[in-house]
Each structure stands twice: as C-alpha cells, then as structure tokens.
Amino acid sequence: MPTLEHLTRSPRKKIKRKTKSPALKGCPQKRAICMRVYTTTPKKPNSALRKVTRVRLSSGLEVTAYIPGIGHNLQEHSVVLIRGGRVKDLPGVKYHVIRGCLDAASVKNRKNARSKYGVKKPKPK
C-alpha cells in the first residue's frame, strides 16, 4: 500500500485500454470505398473461400473488411458502410461490411437473423 508521500511523488498510472477497431477512431461506423474485392482462405483447421474487400475509409485509412452472407453485389468503387468486428479465422480482418446499406445489397431469400443482413420483413401470405 503506497503512502501519501509515494503518491505525491508519482501518481497512479491510468490503465490505457487498446481499442479492437482502431481505424474507426471511436465511431460506430464509417463510410468506405472498395478498392479491391476478392476471396481468401481461412487459417487451419477451417477451409472455405471467404469474401473480403480492401476498402479506403473516409478518414483515408485502408483496411480489409469481411462481406457477410451468401452472395454479394460489391465491386471496385462501391460505397459501403463499415462496422467493427473481427473474423476469427481470417488474420488481419477486423471489420465487417454492413449489408443493406449504401451500395451493399441485402442477402436474398433470407428468413432468419434478417436484421444482420439488411433484409426487410417478408409480406405474410
């Protein structure tokens, strides 16, 4: 236990918390332009072709973002909205594209977990 004399000489250090999505700079989302849309393979033991895009944020930074859902309409120069959230089996991918917003179309024929993929409520029959 430090004495008052100890604390006057050197005060307690504040714990600096490191953000998990530094490119967003404290914002919930950021607008970005697709530079390159491609597929990449996950690390072991998983196997797939994950759809990702290299984007330039409105702040000028370039990051890699994951495109969730089945099928997408993104191509070079598409304007998308980026949120935080890493993809566990893709190293270096710390951001997600928000579907159903700006140029990223929502997922077709989606019935469950619709809000995550920008799908409107279907009309009841």
From Swiss-Prot:
Region entry Disordered, spans: 1-23
Record GO terms (molecular function): rRNA binding; structural constituent of ribosome
GO cellular component: chloroplast; small ribosomal subunit
HAMAP family: Ribosomal_uS12_B
UniProt record similarity statement: Belongs to the universal ribosomal protein uS12 family.
Protein name: Small ribosomal subunit protein uS12c
CDD domains: Ribosomal_S12
Entry's localization field: Plastid, Chloroplast
Keyword Ribonucleoprotein found: yes
Purpose of the protein: With S4 and S5 plays an important role in translational accuracy. Located at the interface of the 30S and 50S subunits.
Keywords: Chloroplast, Plastid, Ribonucleoprotein, Ribosomal protein, RNA-binding, rRNA-binding
InterPro entries, A to Z: NA-bd_OB-fold (IPR012340), Ribosomal_uS12 (IPR006032), Ribosomal_uS12_bac (IPR005679)
Gene: rps12
Protein's organism: Euglena gracilis
PANTHER family: 30S RIBOSOMAL PROTEIN S12 FAMILY MEMBER (PTHR11652)
Basic residues bias spans: 9-20
BP terms from Gene Ontology: translation
Subunit and partners: Part of the 30S ribosomal subunit.
NCBIfam families in UniProt: rpsL_bact (TIGR00981)
